Amino acid sequence: MEIKCHRVSGGCAEGPALVTRERISFLGNVDPETGVVVDPAHELYGRSIAGVVLIFPGGKGSTVGSYVIYQLRKRGMAPAAMINLKSEPIVAVGAIISDIPLVDRVPEWILDVKDGTRVVVDARREVVVLPDGSVKV
């Protein structure tokens, strides 16, 4: 199934989905050395964001979060791609300077995709590709 989206940062990537309904502050929620979510109050606590298609409503917090995303990329610990309901400047800048595909303006039911589902983010074509039957719409 192809879902139309809006390109924030170009490129194409695929990987297993990692989904949260909570916003992410890259400064404080994520260890920039390992890519592991270190905030015990976050639902992704203890999970790695490295190599996944990270699906979350959007970012929050300090502008330093953009640089944390860049650090993650330099260390090979960044998400393969990111999908937001609505991107904000911190995540957008982080994705752009790190060359990570980022799209937004997707249906809210994208947050119902199961972790591990293979997702393709083709920001060039402004589509997200999900396997048929991966989510009930």
UniProtKB/Swiss-Prot annotation:
The active site is at S62 (proton acceptor). InterPro entries: PMDh-S-like (IPR012016), PMDh-S-like_dom (IPR002840), PMDh_S (IPR020794). Pathway: Isoprenoid biosynthesis; isopentenyl diphosphate biosynthesis via mevalonate pathway. Signal peptide: none annotated. One of its GO terms (biological process) is isopentenyl diphosphate biosynthetic process, mevalonate pathway. One of its GO terms (molecular function) is hydro-lyase activity. Keywords: Isoprene biosynthesis, Lyase. Belongs to the AcnX type II small subunit family. This is Phosphomevalonate dehydratase small subunit. It comes from Methanothrix thermoacetophila (strain DSM 6194 / JCM 14653 / NBRC 101360 / PT) (Methanosaeta thermophila).
